[in-house]
UniProtKB/Swiss-Prot annotation:
This is Ribosome-binding factor A. Monomer. Binds 30S ribosomal subunits, but not 50S ribosomal subunits or 70S ribosomes. Keywords: Cytoplasm, Ribosome biogenesis. Residues 127-146 are annotated as: Disordered. SUPFAM superfamilies: Ribosome-binding factor A, RbfA. The gene is rbfA. The keyword Electron transport does not apply. HAMAP family: RbfA. The keyword Cytoplasm applies. GO terms for biological process: maturation of SSU-rRNA. It is found in: Cytoplasm. GO terms for cellular component: cytosol. One of several proteins that assist in the late maturation steps of the functional core of the 30S ribosomal subunit. Associates with free 30S ribosomal subunits (but not with 30S subunits that are part of 70S ribosomes or polysomes). Required for efficient processing of 16S rRNA. May interact with the 5'-terminal helix region of 16S rRNA.
């Protein structure tokens, strides 16, 4: 087994190689909208999982997925040519859901800020339930003793 540091370095190198190959060599329609976000390689260096995002709607997403499936062989050949390892890892492309998750989290944060502002406005209008200063003062004790 390879050490995890080597797998991480190899993953970073594969990310660069695949991104460059998509930009320069793959002529499939739809690959111009693909951004490689992350790459992970197993510790035995036999399998690489490549995460990507696509700018555009569902039609662009489907076109990009088809283009990646068709160009997987070209990309694997480029990875093999540019790496100095005995076996070229298999490539698996997975759509990265980070942008959708991030927009959902941003929406939740916006709602929380709105609720905080509403609560602060209520607190500013609120009045004390009892006296303004609920603590006993020394002069109150002297007046009660006399």
């Amino acid at each position: 087994m390879a050490d995890p540091a080597r797998a991480a370095r190899l993953a970073q190198r594969i990310k660069v190689i695949v991104a460059e190959a998509l930009r320069k060599q793959v002529k499939q329609p739809g690959v111009e909208n693909i951004t490689i976000t992350e790459t992970r390689v197993t510790n035995d260096l036999q399998h690489a999982t490549i995460y990507y995002t696509i700018f555009g709607g569902t039609e662009a997403r489907q076109e990009a997925e088809d283009s990646l499936a068709k160009s997987k062989g070209i990309l694997r050949r480029e990875v093999g040519k540019n790496l100095t390892i005995r076996l070229t890892p298999t490539l698996e492309f997975i759509s990265d859901e980070v942008p959708e998750t991030a927009s959902h989290v941003e929406e939740l944060i916006r709602l929380a800020k709105e609720r905080d502002a509403e609560l602060a406005a209520r607190a500013a209008r609120a009045e004390f339930a009892g006296e303004a200063d609920p603590y006993k003062k020394p002069e109150d004790d002297e007046a009660a003793e006399s």
